[in-house]
């Protein structure tokens, strides 16, 4: 029985590692942090508990003189119509396009800018985990042709775009 459990654990670990390696997590090679700051609307996202049932989601990034970044995520809970805000902080990572974001004490999560429009009009965001993916825009709606290009970029990187939830704006 112990041997069977060990085999199952090894197989599941191999499958998990293989599935994660199929995602291209490379970030953009350059980032003008000041230009990235400001308001971003959430166009689409993978489902996760901390944003479940949220609509009209947006993020506001503010660069402080000391290099820290203030983060304010907001949206409306579709179940009760209540406006919710989550205040956090971010810091730059080791590579362009990498940030570390925290909404609770000193617990930070990856925030990887996977693709970014040349004019900073839209961004594709992921993390080291394949469970997270967002499409952000400076406007509440993206032209369909642009959205389709972003979806193809995500698919080419190994993401399952059929799991994306389109966010009501």
Go through each PLM region and give its residues:
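A beta-rich soluble binding module of mature secreted/lumenal proteins
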Residues: 17-169
